[in-house]
């Protein structure tokens, strides 16, 4: 009854971009839709809402809404570039534990 998850940032050197899972045009369109990164391979905004984008309609992954049904959800992630998507994941209200580095933790707590 636990899920250990992470998030991905939305930038040219992200894992999704480096693996060619998204291209520059898709990255730009995701930004335009308000995406800050991905949670469970679904693109979310700063409030943790899944953005309206074609990539979210064709992904095969645990729907982020299902995270609410898991008793213990642990998010392990850190780094300056991931702060917006970590914040989005936390804003969803389904994360129970955050494992991160000191710098990221301080930025999240102090804005």
What are these regions (language model features)?
Residues 1-111:
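Conserved phosphate- and dinucleotide-binding cores of soluble alpha/beta proteins
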């Amino acid at each position: 009854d636990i899920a250990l998850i992470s998030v991905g940032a939305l930038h040219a050197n992200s894992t999704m971009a480096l693996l060619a899972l998204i291209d520059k045009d898709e990255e730009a369109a995701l930004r335009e839709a308000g995406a800050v990164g991905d949670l469970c391979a679904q693109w979310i905004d700063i409030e943790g809402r899944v953005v309206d984008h074609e990539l979210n309609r064709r992904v095969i992954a645990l729907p982020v809404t299902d995270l609410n049904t898991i008793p213990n959800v642990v998010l392990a992630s850190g780094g300056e570039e991931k702060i917006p998507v970590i914040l989005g994941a936390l804003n969803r209200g389904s994360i129970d534990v955050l494992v991160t580095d000191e710098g990221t933790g301080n930025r999240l707590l102090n804005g």
